[in-house]
């Protein structure tokens, strides 16, 4: 891994909730799904690490713990933020949060492991 990554470094990603990211509660109300929220959070963490990876390295998810706090309907924007909280050699811990246009909709922690691509 390249030098320079530090605790506090963060990255963000946004998406507009579409029919691709929803689940229907009780079959009628389409809302942003928990797996889609986690996917966005993980990709924000990956984005935070990307500039520090060597050409032969990749980061993979090793752990995720998330609370989904509020429902978000189709057509609303969601923003995920991943902030580095700890660095232990090849293990990077993140605080992950998600917000829609109204409120915080998710929070949790995520760990990524930096691996050599030849070991996949």
Residue ranges and their predicted role:
Residues 12-18, 67, 109-113:
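Generic structural detector for well-ordered beta-strands
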Residues 20-21, 29-30, 51, 58, ...:
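Flexible, active-site-adjacent loop/turn segments at secondary-structure boundaries
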Residues 1-33:
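Catalytic strand-loop segment that frames the active site of acyl-thioester-processing enzymes
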Residues 39-43, 47:
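Short, residue-level hotspots on alpha-helical faces of the histone-fold
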